[in-house]
Regions:
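Non-catalytic C-terminal accessory region of glycerolipid acyltransferases
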Residues: 2-3, 104-207
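Catalytic core of membrane glycerolipid acyltransferases/transacylases, capturing the structured
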Residues: 39-97
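Alpha-helical membrane-targeting segments
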Residues: 1-27, 80-88
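Short amphipathic alpha-helical face segments that pack within enzyme cores
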Residues: 23, 54-57, 139-143
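Soluble or luminal CAZymes and related metallo-dependent hydrolases
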Residues: 10, 14-15, 98-103, 136
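Short, flexible loop segments at the rims of nucleotide/cofactor-binding pockets, characterized by
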Residues: 20-26, 94-99, 130-132
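Helix-to-loop junction immediately C-terminal to a conserved catalytic motif
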Residues: 12-13, 17-49
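Glycine-rich, highly charged phosphate/nucleotide-binding loops
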Residues: 26-31, 98-106
């Protein structure tokens, strides 16, 4: 049985505020590179998974760009340990049981509501930001397969650079996936290309 997402009237607003606060406190600057054209659709945010910060960064993007009700998939063991995330939009996945099918169905159901966004890390684990050969797990394809309603798929690449600052600068590269094909190979290839483009663009910055 999966733990479904909740949005507590105290914890959820605090988490939204805290995400912005802690990011500003621990970074020298924050830049969002790219555009998001709101099509009034549910949003699936596909992000690289490079650190403990990723969930806070995605919330920052949601607050400043997407403006949806925040949902994210989290390992059941971790969600039970850090229970408060369940009240900020977190829902559980357990890859070792049949409940993973229920989680994928639940995720797909969330993406029928235009007020919702769902964050997923298709890598399935934290990896180095220098790894540009990202392998997606098959759950992503199952979520999008045969959906009757349209979904706006948005790519997010999180990168950091210090330059001459003691604190890192955070750079969020975003782009909508518009190729149309929701098969795993197409999405993975397009995301990998976008990741490489983002790194190339990052190399032109000096602060």
């Amino acid at each position: 049985m999966i733990l479904k997402a909740k949005h507590n009237f105290i914890i959820y607003p605090f988490f939204k505020w805290y995400a912005g606060f802690i990011i500003r406190r621990h970074s020298s600057n924050v830049k969002i590179i790219g555009e998001f054209k709101d099509r009034n659709l549910p949003v699936l945010l596909i992000s690289n998974h490079i650190s403990w910060w990723d969930g806070f960064w995605a919330m920052y993007i949601n607050q400043n760009v997407l403006h949806r009700k925040f949902h994210f998939m989290m390992l059941e063991e971790q969600l039970r340990k850090y229970w408060f995330f369940n009240f900020t939009g977190g829902f559980s996945v357990n890859k070792s049981t049949k409940s993973i099918v229920d989680t994928l169905i639940y995720t797909s159901d969330l993406l029928t509501d235009k007020e919702n966004m769902v964050l997923i890390f298709p890598q399935g684990e934290i990896q180095s930001l220098h790894n540009q050969s990202i392998q997606f797990e098959r759950g992503l394809e199952r979520i999008l397969r045969n959906k009757e309603n349209a979904v706006q798929v948005v790519f997010l690449v999180n990168l950091i650079d210090y330059f001459s600052n003691p604190k890192p600068g955070i750079y969020f590269h975003i782009r909508e996936y518009t190729e149309g094909a929701f098969d795993l190979k197409s999405i993975q290839q397009n995301y990998t290309e976008f990741y490489a483009d983002s790194v190339g663009k990052q190399m032109t910055f000096n602060q």
